């Protein structure tokens, strides 16, 4: 059975074959994760990628599976977090696909949610021209989350769709054609252990949230942090709120830590198509062009009002971001 047997009108005809291939591999990856530890150790380190990050066995397995499945498809160029350079799959192909085959792999041994993130552009004459371009030129993007449910969230530029894997039929079932980010929430996601390294506007925003009912926001907030971009995104699509991974003062974090091409751009596309916002803290993510294949960027996304508020903190005069939160009454509520 094909992975998307229902609602054939939901996927553009020119992308149907590629989506079928992505969906088929995602189903196999989900099954492999479910059997992890029985047949093989999926969490064991087996190398490093181009940026020196440790590669788990499942990182490499997933990358190989997606790359092989896309050979002979309309994908001309394939760029992966696990590959130093882009790979040519089909000289006659019309598409360029960037992928994080297994996001959140540090969670494998703790049985927390991991996922796959993908982004599709029209192919240009070269891999560089195909990928080093505006995020707004995406024609499709999405992610698969391997959790208690296996879900795919995907956008083809006309809203965001939600599919759930039916384990009985081993196929993805469309359950929502128009996912929307809830406009309001009292949740924020950030790794608070790095507070001392953040820029002042980010510290000011978090200070005001943590101050709760006694601060300028006048309400209590809850912090979340899952160390899995797909899991954070899935929660925000369900409950609203905001995710922050800012640049900071540590070596190697000056431009943030998340990669633009196959993490931030596709997630921003999915979120904005669902009515949310996505920036680098100040400017829209989809209005940017990466300088190299594995370029990093700060990333803020979630409910549109929350994202806009964080941008406004960057516009405050220096004396206000350094002031006690009681003097930032402009940001009440």
Swiss-Prot record:
Amino-acid positions noted as binding Mg(2+) 2 in the UniProt annotation, renumbered to this chain: 100, 103, 263
InterPro entries for this protein: FBPase_C_dom, FBPase_class-1, FBPase_N, FBPtase, Fructose_bisphosphatase_AS
TM region positions: none
Localisation per UniProt entry: Cytoplasm
Top EC category: hydrolase
Cystine pairs: none
Cofactors named for this entry: Mg(2+)
Pathway it works in: Carbohydrate biosynthesis; Calvin cycle
Enzyme Commission identifier(s): 3.1.3.11
Pfam families with a match to the protein in the record: FBPase, FBPase_C
GO molecular function (one): magnesium ion binding
Cofactor mode of binding and number, as noted: Binds 2 magnesium ions per subunit.
Annotated family: Belongs to the FBPase class 1 family.
NCBIfam families listed in its UniProt record: PRK09293.1-4
Subunit and partners: Homotetramer.
Protein name: Fructose-1,6-bisphosphatase class 1 1
Organism taxonomic ancestry: Bacteria, Pseudomonadati, Pseudomonadota, Alphaproteobacteria, Rhodobacterales
